[in-house]
Swiss-Prot record:
InterPro entries: Alkaline_phosphatase_core_sf, DeoB, Metalloenzyme, Phosphopentomutase_DeoB_cap_sf. Its main location: cytoplasm. Pathway: Carbohydrate degradation; 2-deoxy-D-ribose 1-phosphate degradation; D-glyceraldehyde 3-phosphate and acetaldehyde from 2-deoxy-alpha-D-ribose 1-phosphate: step 1/2. Mn(2+) 1 binds at residues 10, 342-343. Gene3D superfamilies: Alkaline Phosphatase, subunit A (3.40.720.10), Phosphopentomutase (3.30.70.1250). Keywords: Cytoplasm, Isomerase, Manganese, Metal-binding. This is Phosphopentomutase. Its EC number is 5.4.2.7. It comes from Aeromonas hydrophila subsp. hydrophila (strain ATCC 7966 / DSM 30187 / BCRC 13018 / CCUG 14551 / JCM 1027 / KCTC 2358 / NCIMB 9240 / NCTC 8049). The gene is deoB. GO terms for cellular component: cytosol.
Length: 402
């Protein structure tokens, strides 16, 4: 029986990529800078980063290969039990869809559309079309913004007027924040569908519904009912090939949204690290032969990376690490565990955006030979390795190391 379990540690980069200069990210290192800050005693209430299980899988060694420096505080004198390395991104952007699609064998070699202006970000003709087609009383925002700050700035006015909050970032995204109770969740989703259609000429990667609750400035909180409306991947991914071969592909968290529901046979919802881990373990127990279980642990990115919360990111990493033994106990002889990321989001870096970084490539299980797999020239080596292991058609990009 062959099964693959992919744990996507969203935004967990391990060192500035070779082309980081094109993105203003030279020197970024999500893992390295978190580890350094913890080891130096710079984070109140924290000591050195403690990741014993990830270290056994080769995380520290992968970090050293990627950046030239072993992550401070991690155990270097450890017997590594998995295959470890790092991968450079071929895709043109440092965004979520590009990273996920490339990992599954489909790099994004075209340029996404972006809204570059920080104020009055969206074209007026687009805004007018949205107002008309959705029957809106108007809109708020129309700017680059932090997803939490924009709620404090505009949340009360949104509740009072019924005008949705429209904002973007350095990514190829159009984000819409609305109050779940005063505006309505389904109404927000309907608005996102309308915007997704209107954005077709602009080549924007995602429309993101950002529902929130709360009564006023200072206590607004985003809920777990986020929904991403992605464009379709431009070619079949390893997930499509598994589904077409009669296998199962289980999406946990936002995976199905990122792949626009393509190649998915079962969707499982989950919010927060604890619930995502619980759902993952449940699906591992239930998985049959020729199954991929794919979980996105989004909190690393959304709650800690973008918010530049070093302590929160470090604590979340340690919690994630503490759950790994539960997964290991469930593994059977034909199982492969993959731990990786889709981009970086260094919480010590300036701004609030993603960082262009190498990603960790960690494979573990009885079919996997322990040791370094070195530098991988594309994230697609991960998908190609999974395809080869399961006897699926060869992907157009990537080289298997299994």
């Amino acid at each position: 029986m062959k099964r693959t379990f992919i744990l996507m540690m969203d935004s967990f980069g391990i060192g500035a990529a070779a082309d980081a200069d094109k993105f203003g990210d030279v020197g970024a290192n999500t893992l390295g800078h978190i580890a350094k800050a913890c080891a130096a005693g710079e984070i109140e209430g924290r000591g050195a980063l403690n990741l014993p299980n990830l270290s056994k899988l080769g995380l520290g060694h992968a970090g050293e290969l990627a950046s030239g420096t072993f992550p401070a505080g991690l155990n270097k004198d450890i017997d590594v039990v998995g295959a470890y390395g790092f991968a450079q991104e071929l895709s043109s952007g440092k965004d979520t869809p590009s990273g996920h699609w490339e990992i599954a064998g489909v790099p994004v070699l075209f340029e996404w559309g972006y809204f570059h202006d920080h104020h009055n970000s969206f074209p007026q003709e687009l805004l007018d079309a949205i107002v008309e087609k959705a029957g809106l009383p108007g809109y708020l925002g129309n700017c680059h913004a932090s997803g939490t700050q924009v709620l404090d700035d505009l949340g009360e006015e949104h509740m009072r007027t019924g005008k949705p909050i429209l904002y973007t970032s350095a990514d190829s995204v159009f984000q819409i924040a609305c109050h779940e109770e005063t505006y309505g969740l389904e109404k927000l989703y309907e608005l996102c569908h309308i915007v997704r259609e209107l954005l077709e000429p602009y080549n924007i990667g995602r429309v993101i519904a950002r529902p929130f609750v709360g009564s006023g400035k200072g206590n607004f909180k985003r809920t777990g009912n986020r929904h991403d409306y992605s464009v379709l991947p431009p070619a079949p991914t390893v997930l499509d090939y598994m589904k077409e071969a009669g296998g199962q592909v289980v999406s946990i968290g936002k995976i199905a949204d990122i792949y626009a529901q393509q190649g998915i046979t079962k969707q499982v919802k989950g919010t927060g690290l604890t619930e995502l881990w619980d759902r993952t373990l449940e699906e591992v127990k239930a998985a049959g032969d020729q199954t991929i279980v794919f979980t996105n642990f989004v909190d690393f990115d959304s709650s800690y990376g973008h918010r530049r919360d070093v302590k929160g990111y470090a604590d979340a990493l340690e919690y994630f690490d503490s759950r790994l033994p539960e997964l290991f106990e469930l593994l059977e002889d034909g199982d492969v565990v993959v731990l990786t990321a889709d981009h970086g989001c260094d919480p010590t870096w300036g701004g609030t955006d993603h960082t262009r970084e190498y990603i960790p490539v960690l494979f573990y299980g009885k079919p996997v030979k322990a040791g370094s797999v070195g530098r991988r020239e594309t994230f697609a080596d991960i998908g190609q390795s999974i395809a080869a292991y399961h006897g699926l058609p060869k992907l157009a990009y990537g080289t298997s190391f299994l």
